[in-house]
């Protein structure tokens, strides 16, 4: 099962959190979901140059707060905060609401799965050999402290007539282990031959709750009674 499903969705509530954090009612849920989708599409398009890894949307009463996690936050803020104000005005025009935006920096961009997937997609659009692009991203992630990386590309690779899937993996990527911290990213490369899908899994180590310790079970050897002789009494 771990090989098929989205590893982030599988670990929600264990070691991953939701990216849309609000409590809906039956009346407001559809409009909130539609708004979240519009906000994400707008920010991804407008801030693509900044390397956006994650967009977290929080709602409390009538307040709407958006947190953008990016590799280059300085490009989003701009000189004296001019660029961030333009983004706020664009969101206000889009959803007709006041929005507060927080910017966070990705500490290790090379070990971020979403940024790695977008990096591979960008290289494929520039006609870089797909194997070279995949291996380059994997090496960068491992150097940044990742314990395992898996990259998969699907489509008309190298302009082939028949679409196929190829993948490479280095290190450990335990998708079935729920306590494993697996980062997942997906991107699409728009090439002249068609769309190529890129998926990246990065294993960053295992996360255990504080206070939980695993005790080694002592082996208990049962003492058996001596076997009775099968021979009859003489």
From Swiss-Prot:
Gene3D superfamilies: 3.30.300.20, Ribosomal protein S3, C-terminal domain. Residues 39-107 form the KH type-2 domain. GO terms for molecular function: mRNA binding; rRNA binding; structural constituent of ribosome. Transmembrane segments: none annotated. CDD domains: KH-II_30S_S3 (cd02412). One of its GO terms (biological process) is translation. Disulfide bonds: none annotated. It comes from the Bacteria. Pfam families: KH_2 (PF07650), Ribosomal_S3_C (PF00189). Keywords: Ribonucleoprotein, Ribosomal protein, RNA-binding, rRNA-binding. One of its GO terms (cellular component) is cytosolic small ribosomal subunit. Belongs to the universal ribosomal protein uS3 family. Binds the lower part of the 30S subunit head. Binds mRNA in the 70S ribosome, positioning it for translation. Part of the 30S ribosomal subunit. Forms a tight complex with proteins S10 and S14. This is Small ribosomal subunit protein uS3. It comes from Helicobacter acinonychis (strain Sheeba).
